[in-house]
């Protein structure tokens, strides 16, 4: 609010209130780290192939590790191809390590020469995510143009961009989560349950199990603007 009080400093207009300011309250909140909860997920941002004489056979996969740690020797699966391999090296800047912790930006090498591209995801073979072409989500709508069934958007999920269609809108959710109301569209700043159909499978976890791999944004195909944010159920 433009003229809001008790946000940073105590308000003279609220002498009856002896609690914390909004800022003091926010600074005292404790939240779980988004990087350190769940199963190891490694969305590939880029493939590194120097093509120099010294590193003529180097093939590394760079990205940020979410959810949990990964170690040299771990059996891994590349999605969506479901190709299996093992981690042989983990690079961080100019050094190699036996293990990388969640939140690290690293480059990893795999045992065999396989096809991996940006948008793929490397996971432990024992911890596969869900792989589906339809997702049930909670969407917070941020566009002045209403969200209605049948419209197409790009789902940007980690480094993977997938063309998708809004299959249905079930309801809107009160901002205090006190209840729901049946709805067929979402207006700006509304939150609702939305089913989305994807043009190709998405590899994901529920948001409450892995925040980084359970969240996405919806991008308008015409304007390339971010129209909404979503959380997979």
Question: What feature does the model see in each segment?
Answer:
Residues 1-39, 43, 48:
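Canonical P-loop GTPase G-domain recognition
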Residues 50-233:
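C-terminal effector/interaction modules appended to NTPase cores
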């Amino acid at each position: 609010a433009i003229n809001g009080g008790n946000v940073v400093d105590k308000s003279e207009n609220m002498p009856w209130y002896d609690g914390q300011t909004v800022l003091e309250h926010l600074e005292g909140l404790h939240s779980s780290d988004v990087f350190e909860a769940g199963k190891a997920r490694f969305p590939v941002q880029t493939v590194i192939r120097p093509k120099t004489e010294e590193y003529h056979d180097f093939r590394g996969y760079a990205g940020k590790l979410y959810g949990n740690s990964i170690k040299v020797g771990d059996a891994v699966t590349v999605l969506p191809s479901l190709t299996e391999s093992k981690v042989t090296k983990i690079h961080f800047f100019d050094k190699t390590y036996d293990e990388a912790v969640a939140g690290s930006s690293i480059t990893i090498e795999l045992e065999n020469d396989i096809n991996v591209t940006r948008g793929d995801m490397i996971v432990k073979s024992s911890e596969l995510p869900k792989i589906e072409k339809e997702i049930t989500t909670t969407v917070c709508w941020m566009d002045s143009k209403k969200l209605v069934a049948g419209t197409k958007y790009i789902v940007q999920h980690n480094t993977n961009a997938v063309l998708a269609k809004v299959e249905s809108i079930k309801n809107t959710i009160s901002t205090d989560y006190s209840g729901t109301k049946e709805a067929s569209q979402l207006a700006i700043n509304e939150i609702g349950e939305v089913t989305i159909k994807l043009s190709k499978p998405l590899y994901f976890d529920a948001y409450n199990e892995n925040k980084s791999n359970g969240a996405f944004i919806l991008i308008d195909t015409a304007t390339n603007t971010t129209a909404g944010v979503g959380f997979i159920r």
